[in-house]
Regions:
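N-terminal loops that bind phosphate or other acidic moieties
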Residues: 2-5, 12, 16, 20-375
Length: 375
């Protein structure tokens, strides 16, 4: 069982070549262009087996649909989602200077160190589900080069203040997407069959709310929530900040919108969704920020939607709207609003149970039980 990245805890953070000037492991365009369709034959075989198991048809409810969905995603009538990989992307946001969060921007770097020490909620949940956890610094204001075990794949030191400037340049948003692609490729190379995406970045609910409004046409009032727990006065201020960001314009494409309003870790999660879908790897989506990142990925490649499973419904105001935009039905609703991939990690055992049920339950014929489907 491991809750730390693969780097040795006694060595400094591992540093990848700059994504702006090095050969890419996989180019963004190749991942967008090679997302496969769902395997309908694998779904058919899984569904037929589900109906032959020693239970009334459909009696395991959404677990049965989940099992069939995972078969279609993976192309295997008896799918597996173990081992899981949890990837937490961390970056700072210039919009934190607008006082939109209950916590100072310095908390991003402090939480990255906490992840590396194994002390955060996601570390606990990763240990519980025996998942590999990797923390990637894609743009923390203070580089994590002295934090053992953190992967450095930095694009820049924090995003721009979206209230008055773009978050990133077009090249930087592409580089951040490719950070996510590389992270998923590392996870798959290590054997991961399911990817859970998490994030850390003070003020990232502000950027996510702006992105959601831009993608859906909703107003700031409709998408903005309390994030880390802000009071009414700061909530009203946060809405005004997002309205200012939206007034600058959002561009014509999903890449333009990410560059204008997004965040480095949000773009990295979107890239991770692209890479996972390209490799037939299910993505267990976490809360509000992760769902907005997933929405961004589907605006670049609609086929990504087929590979998304929604772990939970967050308590953040805009999450319901983000789920609605994706037609997502979350597995859990626990009033969570932490991020880090925590809610998705809590939902992961449901995916594992769906797979185990499909492969390990006896059929009516095997068990000698009457009442099964006719031959």
């Amino acid at each position: 069982m491991r809750d730390q990245p693969s780097s040795s805890s006694s060595t400094p953070a591992s540093t990848l070549d700059s994504p702006l000037d090095s050969p890419l492991v996989s180019t963004l365009s190749s991942n967008i262009g090679r997302i496969p369709s769902l395997d309908l034959e694998a779904r058919r075989q899984a569904s037929a087996r589900l109906d032959s198991l020693t239970k009334p048809p459909g009696s395991l409810g959404r677990l049965e649909k989940l099992a069939a969905d995972l078969a279609a995603m993976t192309g295997d009538p008896l799918p597996r989602v173990d081992p899981a990989a949890i990837i937490v992307f961390a970056a700072d946001h210039g919009v934190a200077a607008e006082d939109v969060s209950a916590f100072p921007a310095s908390v991003t770097a402090q939480m990255v160190a906490n992840f590396a020490r194994g002390g955060a909620a996601i570390n606990v949940f990763a240990r519980q589900i025996n998942a590999r956890l990797e923390v990637v610094d894609v743009g923390v204001a203070t580089p994590s080069d002295q934090v053992p075990g953190v992967v450095l794949d930095r694009v820049r030191a924090g995003s721009g203040n979206i209230a008055c400037e773009d978050a990133m340049s077009p090249d930087e948003v592409k580089a951040a997407l490719e950070v996510g692609i590389r992270a998923v490729e590392r996870a798959r190379a290590a054997g991961a069959r399911c990817v859970i995406l998490g994030e850390m970045g003070i003020a990232n609910t502000t950027a996510s709310s702006a992105l959601l409004a831009a993608f859906t046409g909703l107003s700031a009032e409709e998408v903005v929530g309390r994030g880390t727990g802000i009071d009414d006065a700061r909530l009203d201020h946060k809405r005004k900040v997002i309205a200012r960001a939206l007034a600058r314009g959002t561009g014509d494409t999903a890449l333009d919108t990410l560059a204008s309003l997004g965040g480095l870790e949000i773009a990295a999660m979107a890239g991770a969704c692209l890479a996972a879908a390209a490799g037939r790897t299910p993505v267990l989506v976490d809360g509000f920020i992760a769902t907005v990142a997933a929405l961004a990925s589907t605006r670049m490649a609609p086929g990504v939607r087929d590979y998304l499973v929604f772990g939970h419904r967050s308590d953040e105001a805009g999450h319901g709207e983000a789920l609605a935009a994706l037609g997502g039905e979350p597995l859990l609703s626990l009033g969570l609003r932490l991020g880090e991939g925590s809610g998705a990690a809590l939902a992961y055992p449901l995916l594992a149970s769906a797979c185990a049920m499909l492969s390990e339950m006896a059929t009516f014929a095997d068990a000698g039980v009457e009442g099964g489907p006719s031959a």
